[in-house]
């Protein structure tokens, strides 16, 4: 029998069998794999093929013929086209189940892990007392473009494109962030200030970047401009001062053709150079370029679990690789008052922030080094030793050379904090081949309504 040759705009009916890592439904048409945004497992749907590759295709959801019992009506009116939330159409309980299953499947399929031998702790969701899977984010980056009415509009890009989906507020951002967005956009439209035109590389305002300290309520606003001057800036400043918690106004000049949001030139125009926030009794200073987790409520749970998995008694030497501004490092330093924490980070500004944060909290048992961990660690190992290594890499996971370095340090435990189940599974397999066994694991839902999650794994040296 000849295999059907699918082409763009073909329509077909399929059963959704599974869900991908980004929340897309997965089904098959005559053996051909199709990814369908907005479709849920168990649903029979009609789809139209939009992109056809040799082994798989991407299709648009045209009709849900048989809906899932877990399908819900999205709260946000642009949940479908917007690239921000991929799971608003799925009940929150089902979102948690999908995320946990995704991690388990990756560890089994890619990592070759026998889950019967792993202690699996239930996923940490935002469904506890006084918690909500809405309005949890402490950071927003709104691109600004020109609308059809000739005035500036802000929003988010449609998935996989730079087509702006205009929004007036976002259901996963803190209400104060939405208030700031409204203040800035009312000002831009009132004064006739242009948004960025990506095609012609013209206009003035490229992005509105807002951060808020969840536990302090402090608010930072950064406007990313093509030029250094914002017309009638003083008027906007007076309006922003009426927002509860408003602390800082920055202007970032970015005149390059680039997808990078902030320019090299970031200037403080009003207030403090940073805002502060707190996680588990540790305070942090956050500047426009600082990496800081977007969901502090879940971050506190995540770090508490990492600390639990580390099993610290108070005297150990702990290494924190990819330490950023020291968020996990300072958590660890608090737990080893008679011990030592060494944080390693390749971004110089983050290392400077980490040192300032240690000083802010009065920690003298933590130090930070700038460089690649595989270069920094060997030279300091004889001086400090290593009882526990904590690693929190980006989505790409750890380079092979870093894994080898970690193993050569011979810690009793490795605590791996991951934001990507596939690369986590790959690295768990590599570490297993080098003598470290996966003992305990827990998923934390850092991004309700979205497809991503964080996982903490405890790995123990087999010959200890």
Short names for language-model regions:
Residues 164-206, 227-253:
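Internal alpha/beta scaffold segment
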């Amino acid at each position: 029998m000849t295999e059907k040759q699918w082409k763009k705009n073909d329509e077909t009916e399929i059963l959704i069998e599974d869900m991908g890592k980004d929340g897309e439904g997965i089904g098959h048409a005559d053996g051909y794999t199709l990814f369908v945004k907005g479709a849920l497992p168990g649903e029979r749907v009609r789809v139209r093929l939009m992109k056809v590759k040799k082994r798989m295709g991407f299709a648009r959801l045209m009709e849900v013929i048989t809906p899932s019992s877990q399908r819900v009506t999205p709260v946000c009116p642009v949940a479908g086209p917007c690239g921000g939330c991929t799971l608003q159409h799925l009940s929150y309980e089902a979102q948690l189940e999908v995320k946990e299953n995704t991690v388990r499947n990756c560890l089994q399929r890619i990592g070759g892990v026998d889950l019967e031998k792993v202690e699996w702790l239930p996923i940490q969701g935002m469904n506890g007392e006084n918690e909500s899977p809405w309005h949890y984010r402490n950071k927003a980056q709104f691109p600004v473009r020109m609308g059809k009415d000739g005035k500036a509009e802000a929003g988010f890009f449609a998935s996989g494109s730079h087509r702006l989906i205009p929004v007036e507020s976002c259901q996963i951002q803190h209400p104060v962030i939405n208030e700031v967005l409204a203040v800035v956009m009312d000002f831009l439209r009132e004064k006739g200030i242009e948004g960025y035109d990506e095609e012609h590389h013209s206009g003035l305002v490229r992005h509105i970047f807002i951060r808020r300290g969840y536990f302090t309520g402090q608010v930072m606003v950064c406007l990313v401009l093509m030029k250094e001057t914002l017309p009638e800036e003083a008027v906007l400043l007076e309006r922003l001062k009426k927002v509860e918690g408003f602390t800082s106004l920055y202007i970032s000049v970015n005149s390059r053709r680039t997808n990078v949001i902030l320019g090299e030139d970031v200037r403080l125009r009003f207030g403090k150079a940073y805002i502060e926030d707190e996680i588990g009794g540790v305070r942090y200073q956050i500047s426009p370029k600082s990496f800081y987790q977007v969901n502090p409520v879940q971050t506190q749970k995540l770090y508490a679990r990492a600390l639990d998995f580390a099993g610290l008694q108070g005297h150990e030497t702990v290494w924190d690789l990819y330490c950023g501004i020291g968020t996990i490092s300072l958590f660890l330093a608090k737990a080893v008052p008679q011990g030592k924490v060494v944080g390693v980070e390749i971004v110089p500004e983050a290392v400077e922030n980490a040192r300032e944060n240690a000083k802010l909290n009065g920690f003298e048992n933590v130090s930070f080094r700038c460089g690649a961990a595989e270069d920094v660690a060997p030279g300091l190992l004889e001086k400090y030793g290593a009882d526990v290594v904590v690693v929190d890499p980006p989505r790409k996971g750890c380079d092979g050379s870093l894994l080898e370095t970690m193993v050569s340090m011979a810690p009793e435990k490795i605590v791996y904090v991951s934001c990507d189940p596939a690369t986590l599974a790959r690295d768990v397999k590599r570490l297993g081949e080098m003598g470290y066994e996966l003992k305990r694991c827990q998923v934390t839902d850092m991004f309700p309504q979205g497809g991503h999650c964080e996982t903490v794994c405890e790995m123990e040296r087999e010959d200890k």
